[in-house]
Amino acid sequence: MSIVVSNKQKIHYELAGDKGPWMLLHAPHLIPMSAWKEGGYVKQLEQDFRLVIIEPLGQGLSDAPEDASHYTIKSRIRHILDILREVQADYTFFLGVGLGAQVGFQMSKEFPRRIRSLISVGAQPYQELEEAKYMKEKQEQLRSGNLTAYLQQWHSLDHLSADQEKLILQGNPEAYALGLE
């Protein structure tokens, strides 16, 4: 288990693979880092890359402060830069899904030399009005403490394993809501 302290917050990450360039894997909001292994991504990618699998603030073993200032994209980029410094990676390939892709978009804009290439899934760099409204509704749902109702959206798509759901349900709903801001 690897931890880096970034902006006074503990950020959990794991490493895999021992050859090739660095690739950072950043999952979507609330999806545990174990999803990368369960989905077969780590097994496939570690053949050609040294992987950094980040567990974003508010999730899993990373800290979950109840202060919105810690969950900005700028703060999340700082966490990644601190992890890259810790593993001595000058640059990385970046695979981001959802929230991870949004972080990747902004990081590639602000620190273009740190990202060799960006693979984004489930996100685009421009937030639409309807998307903002949807995110506000999801924040309210999380703040109500009813994580089971919030997770229902993934049940219909068969995106969560029982173990992943259990990990999410053990988390802090307020930190999850802040993570959507």
Stretches with model-predicted labels:
Residues 2-6:
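Short acidic-hydrophobic surface loop/beta-edge motif
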Residues 52-54, 97, 121:
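The conserved SAM/SAH-binding core of class I Rossmann-like methyltransferase domains
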Residues 129-132, 144-181:
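Conserved alpha/beta-hydrolase catalytic His-Asp/Glu region
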